[in-house]
Design a protein with these regions (language model features):
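Ligand-binding clefts of soluble mixed alpha/beta catalytic domains
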Residues: 1-532
Length: 532
């Protein structure tokens, strides 16, 4: 009996259970009372609409924790007020964005705009169609200054509508509730639009504002309902009797879309790993600073648990190699967390990037680009090695080689944060700033400039205070720092696309590759100037 394995396993399962409880609360949206109110209007909720629309077992939700813990003074904004995910409709891959009208009548919070932009970014990067299920009261006015004016705010959504269309990426909108003010442009800038009778409406200004502005008295249905826009203005293309009829029309549209399957990347018949995926629970240490062998985790993820390791005996603090995940050919770059001994006899800390490991990883990333093989990054990194020996050995220039290779990579990159993601190590291992097609994190992960204890020591020193481990101020700094470094804070701010169950990592990678491989690679790989 492996006591340490069992302790790790119990702790990991506890973290996953806690995540699922949080998700259940998020899935409830604005609560039962608001859901009942939607049903009384003969409407479906955002999640009910998606469930009816997509193929069975073909929905992979993303960004569920968007806005988590934010806007509490306004009653919160579960899921960022909008439900989004990857789906299949009539066996055609797509992205879905659905306003949740149970959350402040579907009003746009700052996070709502950011989440919409992220989904559109995924669509542009991967050439995937988008379905918009519109049911929104418009901008949440109390926070308009955080939603309206900046480049990556509300207006960028409509700019992206135009860019998507120009690239031949199909967009369809269903207006299933209000669609007002600036938001009215979203469905109109889609390729096709559907409006539901009596519940759907589109206008730049509602009846109350029209009366106040020009004195005209007119009902919303006449102002911007289905009859007006399908028969008079010609703005919308299809009229639907109710939500299900609108969704059926989307299904019919997708049945006729000509989406060519991309053959750019190699995939064969999938085979399951020899190791159970749940074994990961016992490998992940309860204490995030403890050591483990990352190869054991890789073997729980890849087909037949087969992993061809590249330069196995060189640069050992980063593990590189080839494998298949659900049949897809991939390259894997992973931080090795166990302490290793180099061929020169040097003891090297796990999770730290040294010159030799940086050089190895940079070359491997380049080779994967040469072969057109997608790259999976498994991040558990505390940073680059410091000290006079490392500086004289060129750690900065060698680290820069890896950053350069990752930055210029043209193949799909998918990042999984499985533990620590600290400082420049986050950058070198394809953090958010380096355009991974998708970035996920396990519930135990930490994303910050440095660890909580190190940060607390630095802060205390800057404040010219001596610290003791039982000092309340010292402990408070660590607690606050760790909270801000948590996976939940990262997900709330959309620094990551999803917090995933570690045992479901293989499925998350496969779904990401399915999306990423929709777009052919036409560019050639080229690095910039490198210091040698």
């Amino acid at each position: 009996m492996d006591l340490k394995f069992n302790i790790n396993e119990d702790y990991s399962k506890l973290l996953v259970s806690d995540m699922k409880k949080k998700l259940d609360k998020i899935y409830a949206g604005g609560g039962k009372e608001k859901i009942d109110k939607v049903h009384k209007k003969n409407k479906l909720t955002a999640r009910e609409r998606i469930e009816y629309l997509v193929d069975n077992d073909a929905y992979f939700e993303i960004a569920e924790f968007a806005g988590y813990g934010k806007y509490e003074e306004f009653g919160g904004c579960p899921c960022g007020g909008v439900v989004a995910g990857i789906a299949s409709i009539n066996k055609k891959l797509c992205l879905i964005i659905a306003n949740d009208s149970t959350v402040k009548s579907g009003a746009w919070f700052p996070t709502t705009a950011k989440k919409n932009l992220r989904v559109q970014e995924i669509a542009i990067e991967n050439h995937v169609p988008i379905v918009y299920l519109v049911d929104s009261a418009g901008v949440f006015l109390q926070l308009q200054d955080q939603i309206f004016p900046d480049k990556e705010n509300f207006g960028r959504v409509f700019r992206n509508n135009a860019i998507l269309s120009s690239k031949g990426i199909f967009q369809v909108s269903a207006i299933m509730g209000p669609c007002v003010a600036g938001g009215a442009y979203l469905p109109i800038m889609s390729d096709e639009s559907i409006i539901v009778e009596k519940t759907g409406s589109i206008f730049l200004a509602g009846s109350h504002l029209v009366k106040a502005a020009i004195g005209e008295i007119v009902e919303n249905e006449e102002l911007g309902g289905a009859k007006t826009h399908c028969e008079i203005s010609g703005i919308t293309d299809y009229k639907a009797m109710d939500d299900k009829d609108a969704l059926d029309k989307i299904k019919s549209i997708f049945e006729k879309i000509n989406l060519k399957e991309n053959k750019s990347f190699d995939r064969i018949k999938s085979e399951m790993p020899l190791h159970e995926s749940s074994k990961i629970y016992g490998i992940i240490p309860k204490e995030i600073k403890d050591n483990y062998d990352v190869v054991e985790i890789i073997k729980c993820i890849v087909d037949k648990s087969e992993f061809l390791e590249y330069k196995k005996d060189y640069g050992k603090t980063i593990v590189c190699g080839y494998a298949r995940v659900d049949g897809w050919s991939v390259g894997i770059v992973a931080n090795q967390r166990k302490i290793i001994k180099s061929s020169t006899g040097e003891m090297q800390f796990g999770g730290v990037i040294y010159s030799d490991s940086a050089n190895k990883a940079a070359r491997f990333v380049s080779i994967c680009n040469q072969k057109k093989i997608p790259i999976i990054f498994l991040q558990d990194v505390t940073g680059f090695m410091v000290g006079s020996k490392s500086e004289k050995g060129g750690i900065i220039k060698n680290g820069a080689k890896l950053v350069n290779a990752v930055s210029n990579s043209i193949v799909p990159k998918i990042t999984i944060i499985i533990g620590n993601s600290y400082g420049a190590g986050n950058y070198a291992m394809c953090g958010k700033a380096y355009d991974p097609r998708f970035i996920f994190a396990w519930p135990n992960s930490k994303i910050a400039v440095m660890g909580g204890e190190q940060a607390a020591k630095v802060i205390m020193q800057l404040n010219k205070k001596a610290y003791k481990k039982d000092d309340p101020e010292y402990r408070e700094i660590i607690e606050n720092y760790n909270k801000s470094a948590s996976a939940y804070n990262a997900a709330s701010n959309l620094w990551i696309d999803k917090i995933i169950d570690p045992a479901k990592t293989r499925e998350a990678i496969s779904k990401s590759l399915e999306v990423s491989c929709m777009k052919e690679i036409n560019e050639s790989y080229s690095n910039g100037v490198m210091q040698t």
